Amino acid sequence: MARRPRHSIYSSDEDDEDIEMCDHDYDGLLPKSGKRHLGKTRWTREEDEKLKKLVEQNGTDDWKVIANYLPNRTDVQCQHRWQKVLNPELIKGPWTKEEDQRVIELVQKYGPKRWSVIAKHLKGRIGKQCRERWHNHLNPEVKKTSWTEEEDRIIYQAHKRLGNRWAEIAKLLPGRTDNAIKNHWNSTMRRKVEQEGYLQEPSKASQTPVATSFQKNNHLMGFGHASPPSQLSPSGQSSVNSEYPYYHIAEAQNISSHVPYPVALHVNIVNVPQPAAAAIQRHYNDEDPEKEKRIKELELLLMSTENELKGQQALPTQNHTCSYPGWHSTSIVDQTRPHGDSAPVSCLGEHHATPSLPADPGSLPEESASPARCMIVHQGTILDNVKNLLEFAETLQFIDSFLNTSSNHESSGLDAPTLPSTPLIGHKLTPCRDQTVKTQKENSIFRTPAIKRSILESSPRTPTPFKHALAAQEIKYGPLKMLPQTPSHAVEDLQDVIKQESDESGIVAEFQESGPPLLKKIKQEVESPTEKSGNFFCSNHWAENSLSTQLFSQASPVADAPNILTSSVLMTPVSEDEDNVLKAFTVPKNRPLVGPLQPCSGAWEPASCGKTEDQMTASGPARKYVNAFSARTLVM
């Protein structure tokens, strides 16, 4: 019997007919002398031709005689080479429907292992062909549906760990053959994984805290790598050495009707081989497609509760929380703490008893001492309790809040608590209703005084539009400078400005001579239609003053010209020194507004005024066309 090839692609190893069956395997190593190398080299073309001639001469009854003519070949090798490769009666083409139906009937009669017996009933077929046909196509348990993402993920994870051991990978995917898995990997998955990053895990830096905690704690489908040896120290605390925290949650029993949310979690710790983890999860998913989602929700719920409980210190055994019936004793040991600091976190039992771990590590249950363990939620219990998953989450938050409230209540009763010199890091607490007395809150040392709204509104607040205007002003002209708002300081500043301007430009104030009549005239022209204002600006007032004075009256009150003094610096009452104030609004003589008019040249006037021949030729018909229509009102 030849030995099975090392990298076989077939999952069934119960048949003894597995030998090298290639028609053209002549490029192998040459046979060597000695029994040590028998059967370990491929058949050459010369050996095959010689075997055919020997079979034609001697027949197929005595293979030992034929093997004598072939050195380094046994009678079994010669027989198998002829029956499985060189026999011209072998059928190597596609299978017919009659052959498939015959294989199904023979498998039902003899079972899926006796392939040599089955092959005798099929002319031209050998046992290996029948076995491959059954396992890859005819087996009713073989899935022929499209590959799912979950199956791809299992194949990807298993291939990273096992390599091309397709038979081992096929055990994780019932319903999929090793040949189908191999073809799926080579044809589709390898390219998608290597080139497109399919199913690639995110980097450790981008992982969320929930994902990191899940990888470390291995709640539902994770496996530890070392058993948790636990023993009780003389002080009564358990010392645990392990990489992962160990949890032993017993089944909930005798749930009382007083519990506001009657939820019973049956969590068992069972021994499961590590390669079969994905198969277990798939087994649950086949029965109920929605169960995977529910398991993940419950897993995240347990994980969040465990993270909150790990941050709290161990509470006394006799506590208010132990009086709640219906919660079974639960021992949660955090192994991430150093030695001597690990203790049960909380007690949720009926008889105020804190469960303890066995003193002898060997006395632990078999499932707790197993190096490969996982926490699996009982199948039947999940279906009954998933409806109350939200109530269970609220119950856990209520219990956690009650633990925090009861632990803080003892320290709040002290009259003069001592404040630590170094601030302590507070634990994250679940929000709950504060039941502290109002007087106690007001007298609390750590209480921040409430800021009343009347205090906040004592100072004026700048409206939003002014804020935007000031911000734009600062961007354009730079930061604003605060000036004193008293009248005396304003007058002094104005005097300095007037003196500086008079020194530079020689300002001459003639406002007193034609002040009041001129201001009245301006007001009349502003309130009058446009025609009057046009006549005013063409009057002799501008020529008499030579544009040297600003048109303001020295005796007119602020009410007559409300839009003149709008600046905060200039909003001051009229002082005695009016002449100096009026000088600030004069216009220097050496700044002419309009230059002297110059007559147009003879060549420029026709071109600019449209008097050239071409322009007159074009504008003449246009005028005639426009004049033909009467004037009409434009309706918008």
Curated annotation (Swiss-Prot):
Residues 328-460 are annotated as: Negative regulatory domain. GO terms for biological process: B cell differentiation; calcium ion transport; cellular response to hydrogen peroxide; cellular response to interleukin-6; cellular response to leukemia inhibitory factor; cellular response to retinoic acid; embryonic digestive tract development; erythrocyte differentiation. The modification N6-acetyllysine is found at residues 467, 476. It comes from the Eukaryota. Residues 375-396 are annotated as: Leucine-zipper. The keyword Acetylation applies. It holds the Pfam family Cmyb_C. Residues 337-368 are annotated as: Disordered. Its main location: nucleus. GO terms for molecular function: DNA binding; DNA-binding transcription activator activity, RNA polymerase II-specific; DNA-binding transcription factor activity; RNA polymerase II cis-regulatory region sequence-specific DNA binding; WD40-repeat domain binding. Transcriptional activator; DNA-binding protein that specifically recognize the sequence 5'-YAAC[GT]G-3'. Plays an important role in the control of proliferation and differentiation of hematopoietic progenitor cells. Comprised of 3 domains; an N-terminal DNA-binding domain, a centrally located transcriptional activation domain and a C-terminal domain involved in transcriptional repression. Binds to HIPK1. Interacts with HIPK2, MAF, MYBBP1A and NLK. This is Transcriptional activator Myb. It comes from Mus musculus.
